[in-house]
Amino acid sequence: MSYTKDNDKLYRYLFQNRAVRGEWVRLNDTFTETLNTHQYPKAVQNLLGEMLVATSLLTAIMKFEGTITVQIQGDGPLKLAVVNGNEKQQLRALARTQAEIADNASLSEMIGNGVLVISIMPNDGERYQGVIALDKPTIRECLEDYFIRSEQLQTHLVIRTGEYEGKAVAGGLLLQIMPDGTGTPEDFEHLMTLAETVKDEELFGLEAEELLFRLYHEEQVEVYPPQETEFHCGCSRGRSGNAILLLPMEEIDEMLAEKNGVIDMQCECCGTQYFFDKNAIMEFKQEADKLNQLGL
């Protein structure tokens, strides 16, 4: 893919004379690294790309330190799809299938009867969870409905996934009326109509400044400094070792015997493998016992 300085970047911007705010994001390596360790069907890849874009945009518009999880659950061939993001624009994604999925499968064909769950978990403050029926054709439309119901703010999303110069890419735009109530439906409708004219090659190939000029050259747009996005799993040897300790020691010993003295743990998200023999497990247990004694 030809390099532009705005690959894997998120921009925020404000229409000064319209009381509407916007965001633009393009996920290049962030998206491809999510897919590298999995052989997802094409339709699932595209859905995860849409969810990554949506999570990035949501995380940026909700100003807090913490994490957002966007999760789809259903009874169709796609059992689960989940994306996590935080205020640093660190993103990860995972999907689980339970039957074959055609490359051109629609959302309803993949999910069956399902829900979209958005969990907002600030580092300081109360956790919030919203559950939305997946009763619309696209994730974009379901999320727009979520904003109307939960935030009571008119919001418009453009979310695209595909290939650009031979590599997977995902990108999107968000428009939202400012919460101060000074924005008008006419202003919002005007900007929304302009946003819908964006072409895939513009969304995936142009730098932010040029893209925004093409779409909004007659508007007064204040663009803020960008934020980098990245794939970040967050797994570690320590977390995997502590997960093993959730099992009774008798069961751990049985697993060691069955696996020739070494238990291997593979991260479902990034594919990293961690190996533990009896000595390593006992070291984790001793450390856990010390923390328990200290009441930590």
Curated annotation (Swiss-Prot):
Q: What InterPro entries does the record point to?
A: Heat_shock_Hsp33 (IPR000397), Heat_shock_Hsp33_C (IPR016154), Heat_shock_Hsp33_N (IPR016153), Hsp33_helix_hairpin_bin_dom_sf (IPR023212)
Q: Matching Pfam families, A to Z?
A: HSP33
Q: Which domain of life is it from?
A: Bacteria
Q: What is this protein called?
A: 33 kDa chaperonin
- Keywords of the record: Chaperone, Cytoplasm, Disulfide bond, Redox-active center, Stress response, Zinc
By its UniProt entry, which PANTHER family does this protein fall under?
33 KDA CHAPERONIN
Q: Report the protein's function.
A: Redox regulated molecular chaperone. Protects both thermally unfolding and oxidatively damaged proteins from irreversible aggregation. Plays an important role in the bacterial defense system toward oxidative stress.
Q: Which NCBIfam families match?
A: PRK00114.1 (NF001033)
Q: What is its main location?
A: cytoplasm
UniProt lineage: Bacteria, Pseudomonadati, Pseudomonadota, Gammaproteobacteria, Pasteurellales
In this UniProt entry, which cysteines form S-S bonds?
C233-C235, C267-C270
What does the entry report about post-translational modification of this chain? Under oxidizing conditions two disulfide bonds are formed involving the reactive cysteines. Under reducing conditions zinc is bound to the reactive cysteines and the protein is inactive.
What HAMAP family does the database record attribute to this sequence?
HslO
